[in-house]
From Swiss-Prot:
Transmembrane segments: none annotated. GO terms for molecular function: structural constituent of ribosome. It comes from Avicennia marina. Keywords: Ribonucleoprotein, Ribosomal protein. This is Small ribosomal subunit protein eS7.
Amino acid sequence: MYTALQKIHKDKDAEPTEFEENVAQALFDFENTNQEIKSDLKDLYINSALQIDVSGGKKAVVIHVPYRLRKSFRKIHPRLVRELEKKFSGKEVVLIATRRILRPPKKGSAVQRPRSRTLTAVHDAMLEDIVYPAEIVGKRVRYRLDGSKIMKVFLDPKAKNDTENKLETFAGVYRKLSGKDVVFEFPLTE
């Protein structure tokens, strides 16, 4: 029997939480009710899901998808996010690929760490996942006098209509997942 629990695969046989089961059930229902997207959703599953409080009393749903399936999820991203936001009314949905950060190799060891497993690379890729379908066109890091850093991220103005109302959510999700402050802006066009 094909059930909603097959839509979630946790690491090392960990039990899914109640919220993760709700997200998996929503994916399962969406697959069964929508015929045009059924073939795209058939083989897709998620790793985990969590709810994050964003400023202003808003909540965001962060869904971690397997790294290998991120291209398939991106094909149906706009429709899937729209449907999930309807299901979890008032909450914005963000899809992020699951990535691992490896610690730096010990001094004197010959082991090389791939660039894609460094903290910087994982955080940059996470930022791109969060703002998808908008594209990042530039970044600036501002150092304040007290030593704190704030990153300004410029998004593609073409996606302004779709993403303008979600910028606060994006910043809150990124701050929660990486611990870094970020401000999203659209560059001024002459």
